[in-house]
Amino acid sequence: MANETPAMPSPAAPESKPAVPAAAPSGTAAAPVPKPAAAVPAAPPPEPKPNPLPHVDLPFQGVDYTLRGVHAEATVAPADVVGAAEKLDREGFALDTITGVDWIAAGQMEVVYDFFHFQKTLRVAVRTRIPRENPELPSIHQVYPGANWHERETHDFFGIKFLGHPDLSPFLLPEDATYHPLRKDFTS
């Protein structure tokens, strides 16, 4: 028949590969199994960074700026935050931010003050911890007037009371808010 088209060959089925390599025929050696690479010894801890402010009477420790966002950190007692702010003010530092951290498992709140110095290109943090049940510490608004709204915001979100602050009325939350949304036990 002249008008018939030849049948198309059916496509070849893809070869299936066994999931597990076949065992070597008896009498032949199996291919060697590669050994895992030797464990690389852990790098030694980084050298501590020098204190960039050795002349300032605060317990600063130099830290890695790329990891922490500051060049040095100091932890002080709550009663010493105003004194720390005064020392940094005398050195020409400006206040950048104030924030809180809720360490619920430890029953503590932390307040972190970030300062910067334009001429020295330095950023430092001062930290303090207070009991979570009654979180109070002195206000630094007398030293840094711009701390006024930072402290109000931290009070709004964490419930931390800054003693001596002229007005801790809600800053960002509704006026009738009785909650602090950044505390870890907050539920909406």
Q: Language-model features: where?
A:
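Terminal low-complexity/charged segments
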Residues: 1-188
